Amino acid sequence: RRLGARDRVALVAYAGASGVVLEPTPGDRKATIEAAIDQLEAGGPTHGAAGIQLAYAKAREGFIPGGINRVLLATDGDFNVGVVGHDALVDLVKRERAHGVALTTLGFGTGNYNERLMEQLADQGDGAYAYIDDLQEARKVLVENLGGTLLTVARDAKVQVEFNPSAVSE
C-alpha cells in the first residue's frame, strides 16, 4: 500500500512452468497489483531456477537507475524441477546480482522447507531473509520491517567478536 507511481511491481509464478502474472506495473495501480496477487495459487512441481531467472529478467526490464531494484522470492525452497542443486542456484543468484538487482527471500511452509537454501540465496543476492509462518509475521516482515531493509547500507560486512575467557566458557 506504500508504493507510488515511480515504483514498479512485477509478479512471476513458477509452479510447474514459470510465467509472468503481472508485467512491470506502476506501484500506484494498486487494484491491478492486488488482482494479480489474488490469482496466485500454490501447487504443482516447483521450477525455482526458471522462476528466479524470469524474475530477474523482469527486474532488469523495469530497472530504475539509482533506485532500489529487488526480487522478492516467496517460496518453501523445495525446488524440484530443472536446476535443483544448491550450488547451481547460488551461482545463478551471484551472476544476476551483477546486474544491480538484489534478491530477498521470504520463506513459507513446513515439511519440505529449505531454510539453508533461502538464507544462502539471500546472502549471495545482497538481500535479506525472513520466514513467515502466520499473518502477524507476514505483516511484521512485509509492512513494518521490509521497508527499512530495502536499502543496502553495507556489503560483505564482517564482525569479529572476542569473548573475555574469564567471563565466558565453552
Region spans (language model):
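Exposed acidic/Ser/Thr-rich ligand/metal-binding surfaces
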Residues: R1-Q160, P165
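Glycine-rich, Lys/Arg-enriched anion-binding loops that position phosphate/diphosphate groups
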Residues: A167-E170
